[in-house]
Each structure stands twice: as C-alpha cells, then as structure tokens.
C-alpha cells in the first residue's frame, strides 16, 4: 500500500527510482546496506510477480516483506508486529491427498530462516513482537465467522494477510531467504467494525515500521 511504501522510503538515503517491466523500484541505503524497495500491490498474484521481478533484476541476499495484517489471536494488540515463522494459504484446497492449504508438489508450509526470525525477536523496537504462523489468501477478513473458519483449519495462526505466503513460495522456488513482518491493523475476533483498520492508519503506527529499519541495521 502507498502508505506503507511512503514510510519505508523515508528510511532510505539518496533513493533512486528505477523501472523494471511493470514495477517501480526504489534503490538506496540504510546505513551500510543496499536496500531495494517496491510496492507489490494487494493479493497473491501481485506479490508473486513483484517478488520474481525483484529477484530477476537485483538478485537480493534476502527478501523482507513489510505490511499489515489482521490479527488471528485475541492476545495481540493493534500495532503489534507478527514475524512469520511459517506461511501457508487459507484459501487453497487440492483434495484429500494433501494438507489443507497445500499446493500439490509444494510444502504444506514455507519456513522462514530461523536466524532471521531470532534476529527480529531480539529487537528492542518499542512495540510488541510475536513470532508464529501467517496465513494468506485473496480475502479481506473482516468478520468473526471468516476468522473462525480459518482458525478451524489453522488454530495456531497469529496473523492473516493477502501476500506473505505467495512471496514465501516464490522465494522457496528461487532459493532466496525470506521473512515477513506484519503489523496488526485490526483483530476481527474482538471487533468486526472496519473502522479498526482505518483508525490504524489514522494513528500512523510510526513505531511499528521501525522494526524493519532496526532489523536491517542488525544484519
């Protein structure tokens, strides 16, 4: 989303805008690290295309995805950050021969680098950081009924978004380490009023975006 990209671009020194096929990329530095930013867009296909173009053009050492997600646990608070340890789809069913959420021929879940997850958990960023399962699908989850349906398949899920697992699958196929940070914008089990989500952006959540900066600085 544009609001997320604006936050992250502000972290870059001497940013340069570059065009690769249909996507704009922003190259710059955070401390001594060369960083490339892009806005993939919403949904699994946009995320996968953006990831492929990033890998083809820049051959990154690792990919970090930053965005917002709905909280699947009532133990979370809005503006907490979930670091994905595993990723799967909540809207994929390929028959009884494979696990719900699993594409045939692919893992049931995609794992983040344990080293990257531990680095994220060690950050002293001033926000609550949690690690766990992120589930993804092309569905804006804004009802108790839908989140309960998802939790029926994935009771350990901490966050629900529309991109993380497709990026994880693409990185798995290309052999690129990956981790996703998701800032909790709303918690459907607590309140299904969509104003939670918009209030989150009104509050800007400046501190939460510092997780990404702190993470890069410690690589």
Describe each model-derived feature in a short phrase.
Residues 1-58:
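N-terminal short beta-loop-beta anion/metal-coordinating cradle
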Residues 11, 115-127, 153, 170, ...:
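Generic non-transmembrane alpha-helical segments
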Residues 53-57, 73-76, 168-177:
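Alpha-helix C-terminal capping segments
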Residues 59-64:
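Proline-aspartate-enriched helix->loop->beta-strand connector
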Residues 72-154:
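Mid-sequence, gly/pro-rich, charge-dense loop/helix-turn segments that line enzyme active sites
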Residues 141-193:
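A C-terminal functional module that forms or caps the active site or interfaces directly
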Residues 188-219:
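His/Asp/Glu-rich mid-to-C-terminal helical/loop segments that flank catalytic regions of hydrolases
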